[in-house]
């Protein structure tokens, strides 16, 4: 096991500081006066290749993919003091101190208030299973907010949380973990100082947060984050207040999408109508008329995947013409009524899909870890399926083309990305393209959905440059707010869900995603007796 215990050297490279320790390199960058990056790398590769960051202060291999939406700043040059026992890096707003031996990192604001501290002599570790862990100190009554989409109370003090996107239909909104998102970011608010600090772990392996759930007599009270691989790539966000920290977090990962006005209205949704044996189009149009006759405003309709039924299987991009006789005429009628369709698409492709061989020829799927010539196969709706690899440029282009031709051009600029957690793909070593470098699904899984939403919006704009895309999604990573409106999935129909969906949505707001909602009446289970 590798444990960072002491500093062995310091060097400066183009405004970036590299702190050498006895077992890892620490890369320090002041992105702004209020944002400092501390990246601990045990393999010392330190490759820059992010699908998430909207603001950087360094070159990134994936910069061309995000041209027009990523800003590169000049790193802030901190004042540096190299003492015998301590290194100090100071910006206008933050001071980062590093004790040399035993190594300990502490972050202070300009007034000298301590915002963050690692455990002395044990800040960062790498175990024999290649899991990385970052330990930080806490006070007993600290408040912890964020973590993306999480059940239970808003404050996660003394909670143990997993970051793993899951298809969690019928979840208990008070007690269960995990849900659909993977957002490794939280805000620590000290009750004593009334100051807050944000911690964003830029790593998308499956991970856990222990927020004081355990206690050891040999250490002060602590929390930790632990991931199944990768670097400890920590962004410490100052600003003092929750509002300012969320602002700094969305500076890093992207500002929320500006949605079309209709996205704020009532969006009808029902699996019932699209799954009728026939004439689903007439049934949906009749539903819209009834809603209007009753005096309710309606601005859209989430068209569930029953429209794609082929031999009683959901096959994305196909149309069931028994249910929807003339899709273009149906879409035009819905648009005339002011209730644009938001059609459901999914990244899983059944092996029995009528176009499956065509997809294989285009080489668009995640690959098997043992035989890269074969697709990785997992459970899917209706049978075994393969999964689109959105980290491959050719696969992204193919998805756009199919989406435009078979969905968008039919008469919509809205897309509903669903069932995109890749939860049923159990082989974490399945191979993905990683934009030419090669990687594993375990390394990049939650990013698939976010990239899917990005290219869905691009497809809408390619089809109609004047359109403002409306992308709706159930899953997502940090940065999903740039591209999509989200919701907390297939909740259970109960008064408990109604109550706890509020802190779930609020927690997402504190995680940079204000465009989060819930199935208000629930999705799974019977109606309550009351």
Predicted regions and their residues:
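N-terminal accessory segment at the very beginning of proteins
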Residues: 1-263, 267-271, 278-289, 303, ...
């Amino acid at each position: 096991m590798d444990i960072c215990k002491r500093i062995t050297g310091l060097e400066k490279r183009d405004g970036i500081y590299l702190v050498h320790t006895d077992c890892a390199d620490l890369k320090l960058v002041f992105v702004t006066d209020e944002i400092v990056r501390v990246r601990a790398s045990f393999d010392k590769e330190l490759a820059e290749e992010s699908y998430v960051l909207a603001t950087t202060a360094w070159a990134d291999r994936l910069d061309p993919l995000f041209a027009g939406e990523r800003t590169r700043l000049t790193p802030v040059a901190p004042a540096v003091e190299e003492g015998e026992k301590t290194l100090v890096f100071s910006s206008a707003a933050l001071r980062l101190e590093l004790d040399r031996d035993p190594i300990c990192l502490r972050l202070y604001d300009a007034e000298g208030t301590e915002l963050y501290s690692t455990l002395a002599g044990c800040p960062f570790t790498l175990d024999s299973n290649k899991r990385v862990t970052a330990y930080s100190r806490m006070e007993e009554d600290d408040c912890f907010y964020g973590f993306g989409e999480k059940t239970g109370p808003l404050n996660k003090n003394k909670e143990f949380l997993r970051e793993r996107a899951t298809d969690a239909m019928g979840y208990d909104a008070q007690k269960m973990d995990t849900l659909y998102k993977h957002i490794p970011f939280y805000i620590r608010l000290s009750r004593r100082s009334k100051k807050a600090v944000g911690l964003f772990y830029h790593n998308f392996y499956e991970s856990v947060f222990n927020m004081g759930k355990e206690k050891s007599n040999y250490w002060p009270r602590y929390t930790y984050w632990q991931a199944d691989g990768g670097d400890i790539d920590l962004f410490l966000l100052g600003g003092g207040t929750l509002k300012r920290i969320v602002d700094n977090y969305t500076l890093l990962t992207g500002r929320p999408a500006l949605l079309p006005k209709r996205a704020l209205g009532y969006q009808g949704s029902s699996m019932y109508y699209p799954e009728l044996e026939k004439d689903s189009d007439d049934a949906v149009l009749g539903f819209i008329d009834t809603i209007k006759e009753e005096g309710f405003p309606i601005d859209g309709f989430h068209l569930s995947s029953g429209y794609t039924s082929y031999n009683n299987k959901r096959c994305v991009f196909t149309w069931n013409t028994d249910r929807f006789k003339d899709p273009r005429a149906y879409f035009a009628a819905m648009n005339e009524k002011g209730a644009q369709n938001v059609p459901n698409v999914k990244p899983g492709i059944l092996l029995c899909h009528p176009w499956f061989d065509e997809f294989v020829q285009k080489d668009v799927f995640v690959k098997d870890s043992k035989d890269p010539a074969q697709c990785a196969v997992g459970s899917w709706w209706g049978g075994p399926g393969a999964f689109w690899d959105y980290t491959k440029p050719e696969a992204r282009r193919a998805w756009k083309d199919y989406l435009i031709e078979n969905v968008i051009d039919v008469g919509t600029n809205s897309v509903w990305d669903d069932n995109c957690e890749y939860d049923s793909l159990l082989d974490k070593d399945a191979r993905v393209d990683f934009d030419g470098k090669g990687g594993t699904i375990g390394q990049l899984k939650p990013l698939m959905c976010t990239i899917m939403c990005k290219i869905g919006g691009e497809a809408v704009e390619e089809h109609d440059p004047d359109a403002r895309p409306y992308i709706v999604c159930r899953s997502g990573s940090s940065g999903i707010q740039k591209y999509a409106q989200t919701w907390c999935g297939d909740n259970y129909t109960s008064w408990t869900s109604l109550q706890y969906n509020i802190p779930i949505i609020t927690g997402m707001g504190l995680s940079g995603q204000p465009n989060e909602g819930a199935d208000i009446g629930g999705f799974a289970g019977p109606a309550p007796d009351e």
